[in-house]
Structure formats: structure tokens, C-alpha cells
């Protein structure tokens, strides 16, 4: 079993009632179909750690080996995840990142954007009910961060009724009724 990490995953805002912040958080929760504000704070903490690392590297000299090595590693990581564009591979652009850039790379958002779900909330339900796979692996975590090279492999799971697996409850019932020849067993789907 892996050792447990006791570091915090989200940073609670210092001031609980700031109208501007509350409005912006609520907008993000609604737009990206998040469960609660903690999911926003988790992304903001990740963003602040990345920006802090970039700020520290920018204080060093441009030819400093630490800045060159760690800066390139940070930028490469962000490009691979798809948060940073390949045309903007500089530390200055890392400082300009916003929470929306990270929220766009969540599996939930991408399932909706690819048209596999009717709404952002439907996307979350599909993921939690194990209907979505990335590559060959079923992923049931809506906050899963999808890499750029994995994005084209997002699809319905093979075991899912949506992906050609075992038919759902209503379809099985209709098939059984049609097989038996009973015309009175008519029921609406869903």
C-alpha cells in the first residue's frame, strides 16, 4: 500500500464572504458542473503552486542551469497536459494561466465538449456510472486530468450500453416483450 499523503488538497479562502469571489466561484461551479466550491479551490491551489514555482524560476538569471532545467520541465509538463499552448512555451505565459485552463482539461468537460453527453451534468453522471473510458481504461473520476495525447481516446466503455455492451434495462424488457409476442407490454423508454 502506498504511503498516505497528508498535505492539503485545497486552500480555503482567507475571507469567507467576498461578493466578487463568491460570484466568480459560483460561475465556475455552474459552467463546469462541479460538485462544490472545494473542487474550485483544489484547482486554484494547483494553479498557485505552479505559478509560485514559475515566479521563483523567473527571479533566477536566464542562463542559470536550475532555471533552464526546471523551467523546461515545468513547461513541458503543462504542454503535455494541454494547459499551455505549444506556441507559448515561456515562463511568462505560465504566470498568465487561469483556473479555467485547468478546468477545461477535466474529463467531465471533455466528455461534454466531445458530444458524448447532453449536458455538463450528464457528463459527470456518465463518468461516475463507469460509461466512459480513456484508452482501454474505464475512468470514473470526473476531475481526471486528460493529457493531450489521450484526448482522442475518450469513448464509451465496451461494457456500457452506450458503447455496444449489454443492453440497458428498458431495452432488455422491450426485447423480451417482442420475443414473447405480447403487444400489451408497451412502456416508454427512460
From Swiss-Prot:
Pfam families: Ribosomal_S4 (PF00163), S4 (PF01479). Residues 163-190 are annotated as: Disordered. GO terms for biological process: ribosomal small subunit biogenesis; translation. One of its GO terms (cellular component) is cytosolic small ribosomal subunit. One of its GO terms (molecular function) is structural constituent of ribosome. This is Small ribosomal subunit protein uS4. Residues 181-190 have a biased composition (Acidic residues). Residues 105-181 form the S4 RNA-binding domain. Belongs to the universal ribosomal protein uS4 family. Disulfide bonds: none annotated. The keyword Ribosomal protein applies. NCBIfam families: PRK04051.1, uS4_arch. The keyword Ribonucleoprotein applies. SUPFAM superfamilies: Alpha-L RNA-binding motif. Keywords: Ribonucleoprotein, Ribosomal protein, RNA-binding, rRNA-binding.
Amino acid at each position: 500500500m502506498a504511503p498516505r499523503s497528508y498535505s492539503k488538497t485545497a486552500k480555503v479562502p482567507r475571507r469567507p464572504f467576498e461578493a466578487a469571489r463568491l460570484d466568480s466561484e459560483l460561475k465556475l461551479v455552474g459552467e463546469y458542473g462541479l460538485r462544490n466550491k472545494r473542487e474550485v479551490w483544489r484547482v486554484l491551489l494547483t494553479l498557485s503552486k505552479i505559478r509560485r514555482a514559475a515566479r521563483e524560476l523567473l527571479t533566477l538569471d536566464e542562463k542559470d542551469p536550475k532555471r533552464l532545467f526546471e523551467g523546461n520541465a515545468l513547461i513541458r509538463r503543462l504542454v503535455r497536459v494541454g494547459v499551455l499552448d505549444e506556441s507559448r512555451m515561456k515562463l511568462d505565459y505560465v504566470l498568465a494561466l487561469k483556473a479555467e485552463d485547468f478546468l477545461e482539461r477535466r474529463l467531465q468537460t471533455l466528455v461534454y465538449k466531445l458530444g458524448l453527453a447532453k449536458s455538463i451534468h450528464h457528463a459527470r453522471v456518465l463518468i461516475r456510472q463507469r460509461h466512459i473510458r480513456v484508452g482501454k481504461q474505464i475512468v470514473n473520476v470526473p476531475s481526471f486530468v486528460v493529457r493531450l495525447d489521450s484526448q482522442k481516446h475518450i469513448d464509451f466503455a465496451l461494457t456500457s450500453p452506450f458503447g455496444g455492451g449489454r443492453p440497458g434495462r428498458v431495452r432488455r424488457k422491450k426485447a423480451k416483450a417482442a420475443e414473447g409476442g405480447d403487444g400489451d407490454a408497451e412502456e416508454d423508454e427512460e
